[in-house]
Amino acid sequence: MLPVDGEERKSEGSDTEGDRTSPCAVSSATLKDLEVGGSGRRCSDPAGQPSNLLPQRGLGAPLPAETAHTQPSPNDRSLYLSPKSSSASSSLHARQSPCQEQAAVLNSRSIKISRLNDTIKSLKQQKKQVEHQLEEEKKANNEKQKAERELEGQIQRLNTEKKKLNTDLYHMKHSLRYFEEESKDLAGRLQRSSQRIGELEWSLCAVAATQKKKPDGFSSRSKALLKRQLEQSIREQILLKGHVTQLKESLKEVQLERDQYAEQIKGERAQWQQRMRKMSQEVCTLKEEKKHDTHRVEELERSLSRLKNQMAEPLPPDAPAVSSEVELQDLRKELERVAGELQAQVENNQCISLLNRGQKERLREQEERLQEQQERLREREKRLQQLAEPQSDLEELKHENKSALQLEQQVKELQEKLGQVMETLTSAEKEPEAAVPASGTGGESSGLMDLLEEKADLREHVEKLELGFIQYRRERCHQKVHRLLTEPGDSAKDASPGGGHHQAGPGQGGEEGEAAGAAGDGVAACGSYSEGHGKFLAAARNPAAEPSPGAPAPQELGAADKHGDLCEASLTNSVEPAQGEAREGSSQDNPTAQPVVQLLGEMQDHQEHPGLGSNCCVPCFCWAWLPRRRR
């Protein structure tokens, strides 16, 4: 019975020991349950079976099989103590290993969370930097757009100033041509006045010779007339010289103004070229900045892709805590927001690049337009230079035509004088012998002989003048027509003998049409002059068919002699008093001085009633030229 009591006591001791060890087991179990966090796992052995090592309060631990078959000694306490201590140590080791693993996992997760927080902070800083850079780029783009708009306005202003200067140059060229025409007219007038002075001197010599022979006649009257004529011619020459000097001064002033305009245009062109160079440099800088922005955007996209890849990487198998998942979701949202902002910035950059492309295309179009305008201006200058030569030739033709009209008027006047001499001869033959002086003097016979000699001399002089004039006119007309036909351009095509009423076609400019019309006028004038000279020669060879001095002049020279007929009518109206005086003197004195007096009276009347080029306004031959230019 003693062993039984010992066993009972041992069982009670074991129970007490189990009760003593049970709080540790309970505390370890509660720790394990708290660490797992409701995962539903229980402590198990390596085989997966639940362990029965945990002691139960009030129950003894089972003994091994060896002790179950053998009878233990009552004094052997190791049988009761060793199995319990070994099971407690193994359970403690098994409980400590998952706690350490969970602590390591928690440490790694805290490190990852700190790293993610650092990356979030760096991304926020990068975002702020990118926003600041984008704002600066927007400001720079706005400033560049303002500068481009200002440059476009300046280019438009320069274009308007260039147009104004071109119009001013055109008007200056027109005024220069008019002044040149007027100077040529004045030079012709000077030449004619010098010729008239020579004729007057020659007539004075003739009058002096006649006065030596017969000083009883109209010497005092002729001397007074000659003195008046000389004084008037000298005054006219002085006035013409003064007018020529004024015209030369005006031409110099106009040339100086033209040079000033040319210098201004050159300076403005240089300024415009400098501005265009600056624009090209700014465009190059914009391209470089655009490339830099594209590289920056690519780098940001790469960084975003890396962050997305990092976020897309799978997490470790251990389940994260609730707080880390919330933070990760916030991080993902922030990353998505940053990605959206970056995409918006990329779109803005693309829009800015498109605007820059449009502005570059506009600048290229403006440069092309400016180059086309410069080419057109050069072509116009070349055309004007080409057209200036035929216009000068046509002006020379017109001046020569005017001088030819004057020569024809002189020839007509000489013919009228011949008719008057013939009338005086016939009247002298019909006079009775009572009116003749005493016989033996030989006055009338000598007068008749002188008249016949003067008539023959006048006819020879007229024929020589006609032949020389016709030859000269034919040569000049052939030369001018050959020049007009052989010159390049459209002026030779329109130089038809149909007249000068040509207008500029759709492919020609105003100046080309004017030159073509002027060429047609010159050719038509040459044809009309050749016909008129043929008829004039026929009339000169048949003096019987000439009209009387009082009758109006026949219109035989065509449309080209209309201005000459008008001038002749004014001159014949003014010559009548001088002719009356000469007839009175011829009835009293020698009739040989009658043509000289008529010539002097005609010169005086011509000076009292000036013809072409006497006024400062446009000459009369230009009135047919100006309306065509105004078309």
Curated annotation (Swiss-Prot):
Residues 519-631 are annotated as: Golgi-targeting domain. InterPro entries: GM130_C, GOLGA_cons_dom, Golgin_A. One of its GO terms (cellular component) is Golgi apparatus. It comes from the Eukaryota. It is found in: Golgi apparatus, Golgi stack membrane. Keywords: Coiled coil, Golgi apparatus, Membrane. Residues 1-20, 128-152 have a biased composition (Basic and acidic residues). Residues 110-468 form a coiled coil. Residues 93-103 have a biased composition (Polar residues). Residues 1-103, 127-154, 426-447, 488-520 are annotated as: Disordered. The keyword Iron does not apply. Residues 497-510 have a biased composition (Gly residues). One of its GO terms (biological process) is Golgi organization. It is a peripheral membrane protein. Residues 78-92 have a biased composition (Low complexity). Belongs to the GOLGA8 family. May be involved in maintaining Golgi structure. This is Golgin subfamily A member 8A. It comes from Homo sapiens. The lineage of its organism: Eukaryota, Metazoa, Chordata, Craniata, Vertebrata.
